[in-house]
Amino acid sequence: MESSIFKPSSMDLIRAGLQDLDKARALFDQLKADDIPDERCAELLSALAHACDPDMALSNFVDIVNAMQSSQRDLEHVIPDNDALKRLVTVLGVSDAMGKFMRFKPQLVEAAAVDNCNSHLFNHAQRRARLLKAVGADPDEPAMPVASKDLAEAATALRSSYRNQLAAIIAQDAVADDPTSIQPTISRELSDLADAALEGALAIARHETEGSEHVRFTIIGMGKLGAQELNYVSDVDLIYVVEPADKDVDHQTLIRVGTKMGTMLQRVCQSAIMGVAEQPLWQIDGGLRPEGKDGALVRVLSSHKNYYEQWAENWEFQALLKARPVAGDPDLGQAYMDMTRPFVWSASKRKNFVYDCQKMRKRVEDLIPAPLKDREIKLGRGGLRDVEFTVQMLQLVHGRTDESLRTSNTLDSLQRLSEGGYVSRKQAVRMSQDYRFERVMEHRQQIWSLKRTHLFPDLGRASVGGLEKKRDIDVDELNQNQELRRLARAFGLHPEELVDKYDDTRREVRHLHLDIYYRPMLPVNAQMENDQIVLSVEAAQERFESIGFGDPDAAIRHVQALTAGVGRAAKINRIILPAVLQWLGEGQNPDMGLLNWRKLEENFGTESGYLGFLRDSTSAAQRLCHILSNSRFLGDALNKSVESISWLGDDDNLQARTREALDVQTGSALERFGSNINEFATSMRAMRRHEIERIGLSWMSGVISDSDSLKAMTDVYDAIIDASLTWAVRHQIAEFGVETAPAGITVIAMGRYGGREVNFSSDADAILIYRPADDADDGQANAFAKKVVEDLRNILQGPTTLEPKIELDLDLRPEGKNGPLVRSYASCEEYYESWASTWERQALLRARYAAGDAELARDFLINIADPLRYPTTELTEAELQNIRKLKARMEAERLPRGVRRERHLKLGKGGLSDVEWTVQLMQLQHAGDIKDLRVNGTLEALDVLEAKKLISAIDAIQLRKAWTLCTAARNGSYLWSGRANQADILPDDIYSLGGIAVYLGYGAHRGQHFENDLLAVMRKCRDVCQRLFYGKTEGEAAAATTATASAATQQPQTAPRPRMHVIAPRLERNRRRAQR
C-alpha cells in the first residue's frame, strides 16, 4: 500500500499561520525534493503554528537544511525528534538573525534544538567554568585566571561558546507557554552568561598584557547587568577597580597596566579582531564610572571613594544602587561594595536628591524624538524606566532605615517593598506584571535581529497616542504589519489586542507611580482602596522630606486637614492630592505651595467650584501647583480672587487683554462710578491687580513671552491712567461749573513706562502737562489742571481704597520734586529751551504719549522733545563726559547700602543701567540722522543699532542677553518673594536664587547654576559697556570689568542717598543761581 503523500491544503497553511501561501508550497516542495520525509514535513507544519513568524521560520529552516546537506551533516543527528524540531522552528520564528547564523554554524542548531549539555540550566559557576575553559583558563582560579590561547583563538572560542549558550536560552524563552512568567529567569541567565563572558575576556586580557600578574582587577556591573536583569542585546555598563597584587607595584605602573587590561577586555567583547570570524558580543559602556567617559578607565578603590565623597552628583548614587561585582577579583569587588553602600543608602538625605532624580528622568523623556515617544518601551512614559524609577526611589528613601530593602533587582525589590508595607500586595502584583510584559516585548524586539532596540513596532500614523489621546488605528493596517503581528503572536494576541494591552500597561504604570509613591502619604481615612497601605509616621516623614518638604510634620498636618470630613472639598482632595503632592514637590518651595493650597480650600472650598474644575482639568491643576510652590505674590493674589484659577485651564483666558478690551472695562467703570471717587478708584486698582495677576499667571505658565508681558503691563497702566484722567477731568468740569474743560491735560510716559517696559514692581514715571483752552484764562486753566492732577493722584495712589496703590512717579518733571506737579505747555517750552541739561535730554528719549489730550502730547513731543533728544549736531566731549560722570554718580548714590555692585540687577555692573545708558547714548549720537532710532524701547533701539552696523552683532547679543535676563530676574524676584523693595537685588542665598531661577526656565533648586550664568552674562555686558559707553579700549575694558569695586562704593553709607533724577535738577538750579 502506498504511503500517503504530504500535500498541505491552503487551509492547512493558513491554520499554521503562514501568509505567503505560494512561497510556502514551494518551500515544502523543495524539502520533499531534498528527501525530507513526509512525516517530518507534517511535523514541521504543526510546529510552524507555534512560531511567531511562520513564514520566516519556514524559509530559514529550508536554508538550514540546504546548508547541512551541502556540508553532508546528518540532519537526524542534529534534529533527532519532534521536540527538537519544535524548539528549532520556534527559535527561527522569533529570531531571523539566529536563523541566518545557523546556516553556517550547525552547532547553534544543535544548541537550540537539543542543548545536549543542558546549558540553559547552567548556574553562574557553570557558565563561568564553560567560558573560562573555552579560552584555556583554569576555572578553579578564583581571582586571576589567565587564558592559555593566543588572542584570535581565545576570542573566537569565547564568542562561539557564548552564542551556543545564547541559542539555548533563546530556545528556552521561545517555547515557554507564558513568556512573562519566565522573564526573570531569562534575564538572570543572560546576566550570568555576560558575567562569564567578562570573566573570559579578562582572562584573555591578562594573557595579552605584560605585568598583569601584579594587578588585582575587578569588574563592577552597573545598570541591568548589575541588577541581573540583562536584555538579549544591550550595552553593558561597567566600572573597573584595580589594586596592586604586591607591594612593589607603584601607582603609575598599576594604572598603566590596569588601563591596558581594561582596554583589551573591551576589545575582546566589542571590537573586530584580526583572525576572528565570530562577531563581537555587545558594546561596553563606561559612562557610569567617575567623571564619565572623560574620567580614567581604571581607578584604585581610594580614588573611587574620594570621587563619591566630593564630586558625585545625585543621579550617580541612584546608579550605584545596581552595582554588583561581576568578574575579576572577588575580594576587591566586595571591598568596592562595602565602600559604596553607605553612599547609596544615605543618598536620600542629600539635598534635592529625589527632585534631581525626577528631573533626570524627565529630561530623558523630553529627549525622545516626538515620533518615537509612544513607541519607547524602555524610556517612554509608562515604560520600563518608570517602573524602575518608582521602585528605586522607594528603596532609596526608606532603605536608609530599613535594611530589608537593600536589593538591586527590580522585581526582587518590589517584592521586598510589598513585604515591608511600603507597597500594597495588589500594587506590587500589578506593577510586576506590567514590568514583565514590557520586558518581554523588549526582548522579542531585540531577538529578531539580535540588535539593540527598545521600540514598539512602527504603526505609521497610529504610532502617536495611547496615553492622553487615542491612536488613529486602522485594524486592517495593523493586521498587515508583519512586525506587530510577530510580536502579538508571542503573547497569543491579535495585533490590535497587543496595541491595546501596551497602552493599558503604560497608563497603569503611570497611575501606579502616583498610587504607590504619593497616595500612601495621605492619612488612612483618605485611602481609596481596601488594601491600600498606610505609612508609619516615620515613613511618612521620610516620604514628604524626600520630595522636598522642609517641614514634613506640617505637611502631614495640612494633608490630614485637607482630607478630613465628608464634605465635597475633602472628597475631591482625596482624589487629586497624590498628583498635587508630586507637582508641588517639583517646585522650589513645596511647603509654601501646600500651605497656599490649604488656604485656598479654607477660603473658598465650600463656596467655589474650583476644586471640581481642578479635578477635571489636569493641566490647570498642574499649573496651579507650579504657581503656588514658586510664587508668594501670585499665591496671595489667588487667595483674593479664586476665579482666576479658571484661567489656568485655557490659554485663551491667560492671554493678555488687548487695549481695546481694557478700554471697554474702564469705560464701564467711568459710567458706573462717575460720581464716586472711592468706588472708581477701587475698581481701577482692582482691575490693575487682576490684570497683573493674569499676566503673571500667563508668564509663569509659558503662555506669553518676556517681552509680551512687559508690553501687556504697560497697556494696563495706559488704560487705567487714561480712564482715571478722564474721570478727574469730568469731575472737575462739574466742580468748576463749566461745560468744557478750561485746559487740555496730557500724561507723557517716561522711563521704563515710556519704553513700554513696565515690570511687576514698576512705578509709572510720567510728566503732566496742560494747555489752556482757547476761551480760558491762564489762572483758571492752572487751577483746573492742579485739581485734576489732585484727583488723578487720589484715584491712583491716595487713601481712598484698600486696593494696592498705582504709583505715579512725577520726579522726572522739570525741576524734579521742587517743580510743580503739572506744568503748562508754554512753561515746558521755556524750561527745556533755556535750562534743560544733558541728562534731561537723555530722559526724553523715553517720552511718549500715555493718556489724555493726544494733540497736546503730539505738540510736546514734536516741538519740544524731538529737537532735544534727536539732535542734529554731535555731542560735545564735555556733554559725553557729563553723561558718563552722571551715570557713575547716580549708581554710587542710589546703590543701597551693603549691596555689592555685581549683585544689583539695575545699577550693578552689567545690569540694566549699563545696557540702557549705552543704548541711549548712541541714540543721542545718531538718532538725529537715523529716524529708525527714534524709538522708546531699549531692545527696539538696540535692534536698529545692530541693523545699521553702529554696534557689532556680538556686542548686541551680549547687551540684549543681559537686559533680558536682568529684567526677567527682577520680575521673577518680585513674583517669588512678593517684595518690591528687594526685586532689584540678586540674593546671596542659593535657595532664593533657585526661586528666581524658575522664572528664567531653570528647574527648581538650580540657584547656583542660575547665579553663575547670570553673573557671567553681566560681566560680558559690563565689558561691552566699558567700551561703548565709557570709550575704553578692549584691554582697558577687560581690566576694569575684572577689577574690584572702588573704595568709595565699598565704604559704609550712613544714610540712604536720594534718587539721582531728584538730585540732578537741584544741582542745575544751583548752577543757574550762581550764573545769575
Curated annotation (Swiss-Prot):
SUPFAM superfamilies per the UniProt record, alphabetical: Nucleotidyltransferase, Nucleotidyltransferase substrate binding subunit/domain
Keyword annotations: ATP-binding, Magnesium, Multifunctional enzyme, Nucleotide-binding, Nucleotidyltransferase, Transferase
Compositional bias ranges of the Low complexity kind: 1042-1056
Cofactor dependence: Mg(2+)
Residues covered by region (Adenylyl transferase): 524-1076
EC number(s) from the headed UniProt entry: 2.7.7.89, 2.7.7.42
InterPro entries: GlnE (IPR023057), GlnE_rpt_dom (IPR005190), NT_sf (IPR043519), PII_UdlTrfase/GS_AdlTrfase (IPR013546)
Reactions performed catalytically: [glutamine synthetase]-O(4)-(5'-adenylyl)-L-tyrosine + phosphate = [glutamine synthetase]-L-tyrosine + ADP; [glutamine synthetase]-L-tyrosine + ATP = [glutamine synthetase]-O(4)-(5'-adenylyl)-L-tyrosine + diphosphate
GO cellular component: cytosol
Keyword rRNA-binding found: no
One BP term from GO: regulation of glutamine family amino acid metabolic process
Any GO MF annotation of the entry: [glutamine synthetase]-adenylyl-L-tyrosine phosphorylase activity
Family: Belongs to the GlnE family.
PANTHER family in alphabetical order: BIFUNCTIONAL GLUTAMINE SYNTHETASE ADENYLYLTRANSFERASE_ADENYLYL-REMOVING ENZYME, GLUTAMINE SYNTHETASE ADENYLYLTRANSFERASE
Listed name of the protein: Bifunctional glutamine synthetase adenylyltransferase/adenylyl-removing enzyme
Species this protein is from: Bifidobacterium longum (strain DJO10A)
Gene: glnE
